[in-house]
Amino acid sequence: LKNLHNTKSPKIVGIASGLYPFLYNYYSNFTLVDSLAQLLFFIAFFLVIPIIINFLLKIFSKKITFAAKHYDLLLTFSNVVGFAALLTYSIIGPVKKIILLVMILMFGFSFLLKKHLNKVIILEYILALIVAIQLAVYVGNNINLSSGWKQLPDNISEVTFKKRPNVYIIQPDGYANANTLKSEPYHIDNSNFESFLIEKDFKIYPNFRSNYTNTITSNSSMFAMKHHYYKNPKGNTKEAYGLRKSIASNNVVVSVFNKNNYKTSLIIEFPYIIVNRPTLGYDYCSIPYKELSFLSRGFDMAVNSLDEMKKAIKENKNQANFYFIEKILPGHISVTKNQSKGKEEERK
């Protein structure tokens, strides 16, 4: 703690700028940022870059008169503006306009904090300590969640197909079943589409529904071919750890198709289910990791899933294929009252 009084130390000030936002980002979004590649990136983003900026300020203060005269103020700018910008990202993600607005506001506020930088830094470290404890408790409670629910009661994972048709799982997110669409809150006449499905020998399950509140919990159950109870009955708890890997990694469904020499393709329009960069079990994904920003929260880039589907079908027409096509938009209705826009707006 004695070193914290040295507010002109580039390392102390730089770490103070990013440590709490770094830990808060992991505490609030752990299931989105749990890969090693992301950890290394965020260490550089939250901690190394602020330290480098402060070292540069120190160098400039020795060579440039203006920087030397106003070094304390520049250091305050670096700390306060950096802390606010990084924390804003941790809370809302890469929303550039809001982050820029926060930086502008905190730039002005920094003039008032110039004489209190020592107290500001101590407060930032105290906040970091508090969230570090919260993060440790969360990780301790979740990192070792039992995967026993994924154990299958038989050897279906070793099945060998006698026929090899193309298989398509087409998932319009939140698309209600035939009976539900006709009633509240939807009141949608979907008879033309239902007639088309019947004409093409599709099987319609009128009252089919998911017991889960969102895409991740529902799909993790489907691809594990087992029911799980995470988030039940506590619907307001954080997303259970590891569920995304149950969808995008080598789950039992994908592994069965891989063992039967299928080409497996994950067609997604948003990187929502792969934002934490799990090791993919599919042969192909419509969003490669090299195009996925480390700052992404899953909805800040998009591809045309229909175009991707047409491309995949054309390229793979001479082999058996398994496709999981997830269409996020327009999304499911709100599942809690406080998030709902009201019956009429949700129906739209």
Write out the residue ranges for each language-model feature.
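Membrane-interface anchor segments at the N-terminal boundary of transmembrane helices
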Residues: 33-46, 293, 297-303, 347-348
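Feature captures the catalytic ectodomains and active-site-proximal regions of enzymes
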Residues: 29-37, 61, 331-333, 340-348
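Helix-boundary/low-complexity linker signature
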Residues: 7, 163-164
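Alpha-helical membrane-embedding segments
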Residues: 132-143, 153-161, 180-187
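Transmembrane and membrane-interface helices of multi-pass
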Residues: 1-146
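A long, amphipathic alpha-helix that forms part
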Residues: 146-162, 310, 340-348
